[in-house]
């Protein structure tokens, strides 16, 4: 019998990707295609759902043919996706009734303020683990029902379907047969009770969203059904679904309570596995579902930082002090440390654990002796400081002391940043050999469901270290750095609060 592989589909915010993995978790083949970002008004962000499907189906076929294989070589398909992005389509025609409203879209911010004024925030947080925010799917669905002609009537008649991107892909891969999602994607809608594992009727009523629109919620690792499209000649089991950050946590094999990963991308996403019980955050973190395998649910705490790698793009595009992002490490190494210069990159407000929408980027401690190297160093340091703020909040909420931080994402290739991250945390930052942890997590979930891999223990043995960064900064110096950062954060907030 020929060797078989797992196909992971990674549907992201700017591109659709497909990756083939072998039994050792190695990448065999990759295909990627970008798609359009649509900005109808300031603060609005949309995608064309048909383009999402076309690009994802296209790269799926491409990754398989690139490797000289066909559908019979694929043991299972796992899906991971940009979370919260909202699609509503007509069940009969299969056509979207409006563009996908993307997670970044802020058009429903005023409606969220109304919900808070009605006193809904405590109920939403208690049931879903989420704050009331336009980031999540619920108010996006409501906007479509209120603003697309005939949508409300069709929804009442049961003619419309809602789904996050995973649901939309499965619906199309199964020729409109399966309307499902997994618990991780459901947990990001602001409509799913993470304790009962059911759609919450009281929240649906409060938002005036018919339950008939919603997909069936399934575990993250399960054989859902076979593909039925012409993308592949043979039927392949669809067997794993998880939102991107949940998949990355699983791909990093953070399978035990207290294990944490940080994905350093445009922003940072830190997720801590908190085991089988949800922990309510007292420090402005989000309580969410890590994954469900069989009957077992794992919960997580999550904190998101808006500006991480984006601060390096700003050094390049805004200040012009580097020509490419890869130059930042060399420039920053031109100084031993930041010499009292601190950059708080609150270009879009501050995310977790501060959640201050009015804060703006601020640069402190600048003297005549300050150079572009100091600013580059302060920019990199700011990524590590913001991550530390979230990790300290996670420790406070969970009562668990973090032993190490598993790192992934584009900016984790920056050795200077990773070393400083270890220095100020006082724990090791560990970088895996396989950096494609999100796609790998989706592959692992699908492979477990089909018996391609035996159990989680087998997968834990596949996790391989590429580099371990251990703290080397003396404790008194680390404390001085942290004190300066805390002063900078306080000053940035004071600036935001000024009349």
Swiss-Prot record:
ATP binds at residues 13-15, 266, 309, 313, 410. Inhibited by fructose 1,6-bisphosphate (FBP). Keywords: ATP-binding, Glycerol metabolism, Kinase, Nucleotide-binding, Transferase. One of its GO terms (cellular component) is cytosol. InterPro entries: ATPase_NBD (IPR043129), Carb_kinase_FGGY (IPR000577), Carb_kinase_FGGY_CS (IPR018483), FGGY_C (IPR018485), FGGY_N (IPR018484), Glycerol_kin (IPR005999). Sn-glycerol 3-phosphate binds at residues 13, 83-84, 135, 244. It holds the Pfam family FGGY_C. PROSITE patterns: FGGY_KINASES_1, FGGY_KINASES_2. It catalyses: glycerol + ATP = sn-glycerol 3-phosphate + ADP + H(+). PANTHER family: GLYCEROL KINASE (PTHR10196:SF69), SUGAR KINASE (PTHR10196). Key enzyme in the regulation of glycerol uptake and metabolism. Catalyzes the phosphorylation of glycerol to yield sn-glycerol 3-phosphate. This is Glycerol kinase. The lineage of its organism: Bacteria, Pseudomonadati, Pseudomonadota, Betaproteobacteria, Burkholderiales.
